[in-house]
Curated annotation (Swiss-Prot):
The lineage of its organism: Bacteria, Pseudomonadati, Myxococcota, Myxococcia, Myxococcales. This is Probable transcriptional regulatory protein MXAN_4974. It comes from the Bacteria. It comes from Myxococcus xanthus (strain DK1622). The keyword DNA-binding applies. Disulfide bonds: none annotated. One of its GO terms (cellular component) is cytosol. Belongs to the TACO1 family. InterPro entries: Integrase-like_N, TACO1_YebC-like_2nd/3rd_dom, TACO1_YebC_N, Transcrip_reg_TACO1-like, Transcrip_reg_TACO1-like_dom3, YebC-like.
Length: 249
């Protein structure tokens, strides 16, 4: 597995336990609220809400918490009016970074992003500075299953674009952004044990980094993800597995 994918997986695992579990809950609940506000509270007619609800189940968020989040989005309960904002910038080593946020105070979040990038060796860019380097895709985690050839055949038949094998950690099925829910449904019908479903921004090209730059970059990524307004952080970095292993020891 590439260092980029492994680091992303490690971050998701860390978010599912310990002190960061509450932060994961908050992010998922925010997404449910916004998805409900934009597309309505019925999952059958709201693909974004379906993906958010799948993330809530994966995170074991209580049903009543989910229902309140939906009602806040539809206006049945009073709640914050979150705005979607994506910030773009560069990190150490010239790594391009996209930061997806949901905020109730755009000015506060912009100031936080600017100061965080600056404090950790990066700089916040203008809109469009790095977005062109990424493509939005759907990603479906498969916990275990058939051989690579069999999984590839099933995935392509279901409408997927690619399959990435992750060794003992299962595999990822990648789809066009608009096809995420459709492909996931077809794979589930075929009996595959699916995990998380999500949209990601995948880099078209990656930047290889030395160990000192990786250390600086990981500090920036951690700082960005600690911000309560941040939902997702994407970068075009590539970290060698051996290097990542040594840094995590």
């Amino acid at each position: 597995m590439s260092g980029h994918n492994r680091w992303s997986k490690i971050k998701r695992q860390k978010a599912a336990m310990g002190a960061t579990k509450g932060k994961l809950y908050s992010k998922v609940v925010k997404e449910i609220t916004v998805a409900s506000r934009l597309g309505g509270g019925e999952p059958s007619g709201n693909a974004r809400l379906r993906v958010a609800l799948a993330a809530a189940r994966e995170a074991n968020i209580p049903k009543d918490t989910i229902e309140r989040a939906i009602k806040k989005g539809t206006g049945e309960l009073e709640g914050e009016n979150y705005e979607e904002v994506t910030y773009e910038g560069y990190g150490p080593g010239g790594v391009a970074i996209l930061v997806e946020c949901l905020t109730d105070n755009r000015n506060r979040t912009a100031a936080d992003m600017r100061s965080t990038f600056s404090a950790y060796g990066g700089n916040l860019g203008a809109e469009g500075a790095v977005a062109w380097m990424f493509q939005k895709k759907g990603v479906i985690s498969v916990k275990y299953g058939p051989s690579e050839d069999q999984l590839m055949e099933q995935a392509i038949d279901a409408g997927a674009e690619d399959v990435i094998m992750l060794g003992d950690e299962g595999s990822e099925v990648r789809t066009a952004a608009a096809d995420l829910h459709t492909v996931a449904g077809r794979l589930q019908e075929s009996g595959l044990p699916l995990g998380q479903q999500r949209w990601v921004f995948l880099p078209q090209n990656t930047v290889a980094l030395d160990v000192d730059t990786v250390k600086k970059l990981l500090k920036l990524l951690d700082a960005l993800e600690e911000n309560d307004d941040v939902q997702n952080v994407h970068g075009n970095y590539e970290i060698e597995d051996a290097m990542l292993d040594s840094l995590l020891q």
